[in-house]
Every structure is written in structure tokens, then in C-alpha cells.
């Protein structure tokens, strides 16, 4: 399983709007993509930062989403974020939520 972490700068006073957009617009878009498993978002209280972590079956699924779906997500989020988000991709090593064990265990 792979995850994409996207760090974003929120516009002033837009945390509630960001959360609404993720819940009502972004998650339904993500569910249409092959290999999508989960989305977890975090908003830093008192700061204008948010982190979105999407989980994918394979690295290829995550990369395909990055090529074909991510631009639509950015466009949808443009009302709540500013600047260019920073993206990092990781292989998931452990997760109690996703019932994943470390490789080699």
C-alpha cells in the first residue's frame, strides 16, 4: 500500500471550507480512481496548514491518480488553499487501521 501526503497552505479563515470541500467534493472524486483506499486530512489548529493523506493499493495506482486526477482536485480546492502544495509519496510500513504489517514480519 502507498500513501500520498499533500501539505497545503490554507487561505485565511478557510479551514471549515477546506473540510467541507474534502468531505463533499474531493472524497467522491477519489473514490472513482482505481486503487483508492482511504483519505485522512489534518488541519493545524491556529495555523493555516493542512495535510491530506490518501492511501492507494499500489504505487502505480497512486502515480496514475497523480497524472490523471490530481489537477481536478487542485482546481476544486483552489477556493480554500493558496500556493503550490508539497507532495510526498511513501510506502506504508505499518497501519493498525488498514491492518498492514511491516514487510518481512
Describe the function of each predicted region.
Residues 1-51, 55-68, 78-105:
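Short S/T/G/P-rich N-terminal loop/turn motif that feeds into the first structured element of a domain
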Residues 73-77:
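Short arginine-rich
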Amino acid at each position: 500500500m502507498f500513501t500520498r501526503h499533500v501539505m497545503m497552505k490554507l487561505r485565511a479563515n478557510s479551514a471549515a471550507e477546506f473540510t467541507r470541500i474534502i468531505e463533499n467534493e474531493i472524497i467522491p472524486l477519489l473514490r472513482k480512481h482505481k486503487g483508492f483506499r482511504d483519505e485522512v486530512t489534518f488541519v493545524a489548529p491556529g495555523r493555516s496548514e493542512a495535510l491530506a493523506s490518501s492511501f492507494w493499493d499500489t504505487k502505480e495506482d497512486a502515480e496514475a491518480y497523480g497524472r490523471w486526477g490530481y489537477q481536478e482536485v487542485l482546481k476544486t480546492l483552489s477556493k480554500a488553499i493558496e500556493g503550490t502544495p508539497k507532495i510526498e509519496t511513501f510506502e506504508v510500513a505499518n497501519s493498525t487501521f488498514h491492518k498492514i504489517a511491516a514487510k518481512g514480519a
